[in-house]
C-alpha cells in the first residue's frame, strides 16, 4: 500500500504547478465597458441621412468588438466617434425633414 501513497516531492511539485495555482486568475483588473452608444446609433438609423448613420452603427459595433478583444482605449475612442457621428446624422436627418416639409407646404399653399 505504501507504493501508492504520494511522496512529499510529488506533492510539492503538484502544489507549485501552474494548473494548481488559481490565485493568479484574477490578476487582470476588470475594466468597465465604455459606452458604445448602440441605442443612439440605432435611433439615428431612422433619420434620412443613410450613409452617415450606417457609419455610426459600424463605429458602435467596432467599439463593442474592440472591448471584447481587450483594446479598451480603442473601444472608448470608437464609442465616442459613434456618438458624434450619430448626433450629426440625427441633426442632418432633422434638417432634411424640415426642409422637405417647408418645400412641400409652401408649394401647395
UniProtKB/Swiss-Prot annotation:
Tell me where on the tree of life, at the top rank, the source sits: Eukaryota
What InterPro entries does the entry give? Answer: CD225/Dispanin, CD225/Dispanin_fam
Record localization: Cell membrane
Q: Which UniProt keywords apply?
A: Cell membrane, Membrane, Transmembrane, Transmembrane helix
What Pfam family does this protein match (any one)? Answer: CD225
Report membrane topology.
Single-pass membrane protein
**What does UniProt give as GO cellular component?**
membrane; plasma membrane
Q: What is its main location?
A: membrane
Q: Which residues lie on this side of the membrane: Extracellular?
A: 106-109
Q: Which cysteines bridge via disulfide bonds? A: none
Q: Where is the composition biased (Acidic residues)?
A: 21-30
From the record, give the transmembrane residue ranges: 85-105
Q: Could you tell me which residues belong to the region Disordered?
A: 1-30
Cytoplasmic topological domain ranges are: 1-41, 63-84
What ranges are intramembrane per the record? 42-62
Q: What does this protein do?
A: Probable accessory protein of voltage-gated sodium channels.
Regarding protein family, the annotation reads: Belongs to the CD225/Dispanin family.
PANTHER family recorded for this chain? NG5, TRANSMEMBRANE PROTEIN 233
What is the protein's quaternary organization? Answer: Interacts with the giant stinging tree toxin ExTxA (AC P0DQP3). Interacts with Nav1.7/SCN9A. Interacts with Nav1.1/SCN1A, Nav1.2/SCN2A, Nav1.3/SCN3A, Nav1.4/SCN4A, Nav1.5/SCN5A, and Nav1.6/SCN8A.
Q: What is this protein called?
A: Transmembrane protein 233
> What is the native source organism of this protein?
Homo sapiens
Name of the encoding gene: TMEM233
Amino acid at each position: 500500500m505504501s507504493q501508492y501513497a504520494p511522496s512529499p516531492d510529488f506533492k510539492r511539485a503538484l502544489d507549485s504547478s501552474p494548473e494548481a495555482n488559481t490565485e493568479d486568475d484574477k490578476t487582470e483588473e476588470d475594466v468597465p465597458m465604455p459606452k458604445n452608444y448602440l441605442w443612439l446609433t440605432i435611433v439615428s438609423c431612422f433619420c434620412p441621412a443613410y450613409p452617415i448613420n450606417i457609419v455610426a452603427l459600424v463605429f458602435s459595433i467596432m467599439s463593442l468588438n474592440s472591448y471584447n478583444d481587450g483594446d479598451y482605449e480603442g473601444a472608448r475612442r470608437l464609442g465616442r466617434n459613434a456618438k458624434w457621428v450619430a448626433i450629426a446624422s440625427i441633426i442632418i436627418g432633422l434638417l432634411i425633414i424640415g426642409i422637405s416639409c417647408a418645400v412641400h407646404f409652401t408649394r401647395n399653399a
